[in-house]
Amino acid sequence: MYSQNIYVIRKGDMVIRPAFDDDDQRNGSEIIRFDKTRIQNPFKVQKIIERSCKFYGNTYLGKKAETNRITGISSKPPILLTPLFPTYFFPTHSDRQNENIWLNMHYIESIKELKNRKCKVTFINNESIILHVSYHSLWHQYNNSIFYYYMVDKQSRMISKNPDQPIDYNKATLNVFEALTRYSLFED
C-alpha cells in the first residue's frame, strides 16, 4: 500500500523505518502494522514522527523534553505520542541519523542478538525484522521505553496517593492528562 500524504502514527503501528528502492537508494519510509500490512510513504521517518507529534498535540522537541522531565533520559529518548492507545516509540539511532528506525515497545515479543552487531526483533504477531544495531544498544533503548512507560503510569496512579483510584474526582480541577493516561490502558 502506498500513501502520498504525510502519515500520522496510529494504533497498530509497530515500526517506522526508512524504505529503499530497487537500486538501494532511500525512498521515503515504510510503516509496518500489527495486521501485517506495510505502508510505503514518500516522507522521511523523522518527518512522520514530527508530524505525528503535532497531530497529537505537541512538538517533537516538546515530547523529548517531556520524556527528559519525567525520566531524566536525554540521549535517544523514547516518546509517548498519545496516552489514548499504546504509542510508546523508541529510536534505534540518533534522530539526526537517516538510518534511524522507530519501534513501538508494546508490540515487541523478543530481541535476539545476532553476529556482526545486528539484532532480530520479533513482534507479537510473529513478524520479525533484522536491525543493524548492537544488541546492547537496542536492549538499552527498549528498557528506556519500558522505564518511561512505568514512570508515566506511576505518576498517574500516585497523584491521588491511591493506586486503586488514581484520579481524585473531588478536586476542583481535573487534569486531563491524568484521565487520559489512566484510560489509555483499556483495549477495545
Over which residues does each language-model region extend?
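Eukaryotic intrinsically disordered, low-complexity regulatory linkers and tails enriched in Ser/Thr/Pro
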Residues: M1-W102, E109-D188
